Amino acid sequence: SRHIEYHLLEKNNYRVLWVTVSQDFSVTSLQDKIANVLGINLSSRDEEDTRARILRDIFRKMLKLIVLILDDVWEEFCLDRVGIPLHPNKCRLILTTRSLQVCNRIQCQRKFDLQTLDTGEAWDLFKYKLGSEPLLQGDLESIAKSIVEECDGL
């Protein structure tokens, strides 16, 4: 998804907003994260509806097409309740999730199923990203391998 972001930024006719949603989801938290990347503060507003209206108004006033990337979505939610207006000429949404069910419930138009790496490939990638200089020995190697296993090829 970072690759998509960089590609869109190169085109220069998009405003790309990247928000990591994570497992501890709430509408208010997502609204705050979106507001933060937009450079506004919603903390003085308590009502979800008011916060959603403010976000919708900001999105509508943007001159460039907004591409909102919601990364690491764990559960479905109502886009309108958050304040995300989906309009082909104003705002488009890309979301990443491990759950096809989440995509279906949010009514994603297109779904791309990414293949995971097998354990050997994941370990090789981990070592490559670590760099050639540091060598993992003893406990560090076992901890690193447990991290690779926990990521499950993602």
Stretches with model-predicted labels:
Residues S1-I54:
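Post-nucleotide-binding-loop coupling segment downstream of the phosphate-binding loop, primarily
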Residues Y6-N12, A52-L117:
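A conserved switch/coupling segment of P-loop NTPase cores
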Residues L17-T20, S29, V67-L68, I94-L95, ...:
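Conserved, well-structured core segments
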Residues S26-K33, S43-I69, W74, D139, ...:
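Mid-core helix/loop region of P-loop NTP-binding domains shared across ATPases and GTPases
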Residues I34-D46, N89-C91, S99-L154:
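Non-catalytic, charged helical/coil tracts that couple and regulate nucleotide-powered enzyme cores
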